[in-house]
Every structure is written in structure tokens, then in C-alpha cells.
Amino acid sequence: MNIGFISLGCSKNRVDTEVMMAALKKAGHRIVNSLERADLVVVNTCGFITPAKEESIEAIIETAELKKKGSLQFLIAAGCLSQRYGRELLLEIPELDGVFGISSVSSIAGVVNRIAQGERVCFTEATPTEYFEKGHRILTTPPGSAYLKISEGCNNSCSYCVIPSIRGKLRSRQINELLNEAAQLLKMGIKELVLVAQDTSAYGHDISPQSALPTLLRELSKLDGLEWIRLMYLHPLYLSDDIIDVVAYENKVLPYLDIPIQHASSKILKLMHRRHDNSHLRTMISKLRARIPNLTLRTTVMLGFPGEEEKDFAELYEFVAESQFDWLGAFSFVPEEGSKAALLPNQIEDEIKAERKDKILRLQQKITRQKNLARINTQEKVLISSQLSKNLFVGRTYFQAPEVDGLTLVKTDFKLTKGDFVDVQLVGVRNYDMIGEYQ
């Protein structure tokens, strides 16, 4: 059977998609890039917030149109939306032939076989309690780079978030298992591993009180052929001195940290159940900049949380201005069904949320531009990912994470190989991107 995929949401979901693709290929199916050629399509959904749910449902309904044209026979909804709503999705969307949760994505082949025999399938567990995935993956990332999901689930209880109720409690993967997967990825030509989880810094907390992340990073650093290790989704509360030391002293661990702070007002952070305050964030950032040379910091902030007054927004704005993050993502609070924050008083109007988000993003745009301008006339190692034209390639430096940050456009008269590193002279800036030359 020809099977196509639509993968929505975060990088963790992308990894699940890659595991499902490999499992189906192993079972004898063909993975196709064109949905028009597919007999069956799997839409791997996101159920984190309402806009993501709406995008997922829209993708399912749009794909269902292919069934009416006769080119598509079967349609499966997988991922967080399916895990969250289960059989309700089957009832609401009659075009669906199956709903598949997140508890064991490598078992997708059995579900596909049941659907092919005419059964409508709902395959979910109430709350996943184990981490099952140990199989191979078909990579969907650009050459040279891959995500490594080190754990599943989350033990935090942020008041705006429903992920623990969907993905379950924290389940860390064994270090040997991760090292084996990393070795497989290196054999496929991977040179950068991007470590992801719901909470990367909490890796190992379900096994012992101490984070096992420093040990994992040191072991990964011993692998021949691996050049970059990048850390994403670090919680400010668990960023220990041991983690900082590894980032500072292990050459393969990039001086790049993605630390979503969500807010800088102690009042709002308390309402969010983040368990740290403004003072903790200031101390953390000062320590990081003092101990890690050439550090790149990325963060995420939320605007319009219930009870966010002008003074709270002003505190966040001032904090962003002072902290000088290299990259920043911003999104407006959504009162998510099932979250504690949805029931809080003093909900903020959408117009005010949008205004505050726009102000923060305009501030960050100026900061990022100034930081990029300061990089002109420096030389950086660039991982080449694609080619735009005969003399123009696209890649990333250590200070640019895949999918979320800017890129580096490389001008050259040479033929560069995708997935290779080259030393590039940075000569200009275009929006959020760098312009470089390779001679």
C-alpha cells in the first residue's frame, strides 16, 4: 500500500512520524511524498492549543476530500489530538478510518492492517505510562541533522498546559538506548543531533533526583562523527550547574540553549505554576553568560495570560530588552479546555494580547538584527542543508537551530554537498538570516 504522511506540531511529533514511517516500510508498505499517490494518509496531529487543534482538524478534512475524488482509500488521525479525543474524533469525522494515539507509535502497522480489512479502529490508551519507541526512523529533516527525543511526557503542572494529560508523566529513555539510536543516525550521515523532549533538562528525574542530562551529553560527545549536539526545551528550574558545565566544556555541545521562560513577572509566573520567579531568571541568565563563552540564548514568551496587567507586560518587555536574547518566539495565551488557567478570572481580550505580542516581537526583531549585524566579518562553520541555485546554498551556524531560527545563505562558485560543514565568511544580514561567502 502507498502511504503518505502529514506531520503537524512540534519536533517531538516529527520524530513520531519518522518512527511510524519506518515501521510501515518494514511491514512492506511504500512511503510516498505525494498525497495524490497515496492509498492511505496518516495525519499526525497536534492537540496542544486551540489553534493547533483547528489546524489539525482542517488538515484532516482537506485530506478527506481526496477520498471523494477516489484517489484515497483510507485516512488515519494520529498524534496528540487523537490521544486527547479518541473515539470522539471517529464520531465527529466520518471520513476517518482510524484514530491512533501516542502510546506506541511503532505499532502503527497493525492498525493499518486492521483498517485495510474494513475495520474502523480507535487505538489509544487513557494515559501512556511507558516509552516504547526503539525502532528505526525514516528521516524527514534536511541532510546532516536529526532530532533525538530523549524522553516522553512531563512532570510539571503549568496551569496553561494540558500536555501531561495527553502525553503522560515523564518517562526517560535509557542512555544505552539513546546511544544506539544516535549511532544509527550517524551511519545515515547525521552530524548534528538536536535533543528534544517536553522538558529536556528534567531528563532522568523519573529515575533519580538528579538530572541524567550531563551524563548523556558526555556519552554522546564520545561518538565518532558527531560534531554538534544542540539542546532545546530546557526548563529554567532544572538548569543545574552540572548541565551548564557540560555545555561550557564539552566541545561538541553547542553554546546554544533554548530556555522557554514564558514570562518575567513573578506574579504571572506564580499564576502559571512555573515554580520560579523573576529573580531566578535574572540570576540564571547572568550565570549562563558568565560561564558559557559565545552563548546563544533562545526563549519563548506568552502574552495575555489571565491577570496580566500593564505593569506585568512592562516588566516582561523590560526583561526582554535587558536580557538580549538572540532569538525569541511569542504566542498569545489560549484558554485551553482542561487547563487550570482556562478557569482563572481576569481573562485578557484578544486585541490586547495581539498588541502586546506585536510589541514584544518588534523589540526582539531589533535585538536580533543588532546581534546579526555584529556577526558580519566573522567566520563560522555552516552545516549545508539545501541549494537554491547554482551559486547559492542554504545552511545553519551554531547559533541557528533548525526550523525556528534564521538561516545562512551561502554564496559560492564551488559545488557544496548537502549535509557537510564548510567555513563561511559572514558578510551581510537579510531580515533574520545571515549572508555568507565561501571561497
UniProtKB/Swiss-Prot annotation:
Keyword Protease: no
GO cellular component terms, semicolon-separated: cytosol
Domain MTTase N-terminal: 1-117
EC number: 2.8.4.4
Keyword match rRNA-binding: no
Enzyme class: transferase
Positions contributing to [4Fe-4S] cluster 1 binding: C10, C46, C80
GO biological process: tRNA modification
Catalytic activity, reaction form: L-aspartate(89)-[ribosomal protein uS12]-hydrogen + (sulfur carrier)-SH + AH2 + 2 S-adenosyl-L-methionine = 3-methylsulfanyl-L-aspartate(89)-[ribosomal protein uS12]-hydrogen + (sulfur carrier)-H + 5'-deoxyadenosine + L-methionine + A + S-adenosyl-L-homocysteine + 2 H(+)
Required cofactor(s): [4Fe-4S] cluster
UniProt-recorded Gene Ontology molecular function terms: 4 iron, 4 sulfur cluster binding; aspartic acid methylthiotransferase activity; metal ion binding; protein methylthiotransferase activity
CDD domains reported for this sequence: Radical_SAM
Name of a matching Pfam family: Radical_SAM
Keyword line: 4Fe-4S, Cytoplasm, Iron, Iron-sulfur, Metal-binding, S-adenosyl-L-methionine, Transferase
Gene3D superfamilies per the UniProt record, alphabetical: Methylthiotransferase, N-terminal domain, Nucleic acid-binding proteins, tm_1862 like domain
Radical SAM core domain boundaries: 140-370
Family: Belongs to the methylthiotransferase family. RimO subfamily.
Function per UniProt: Catalyzes the methylthiolation of an aspartic acid residue of ribosomal protein uS12.
Protein name: Ribosomal protein uS12 methylthiotransferase RimO
Organism lineage: Bacteria, Bacillati, Bacillota, Clostridia, Eubacteriales
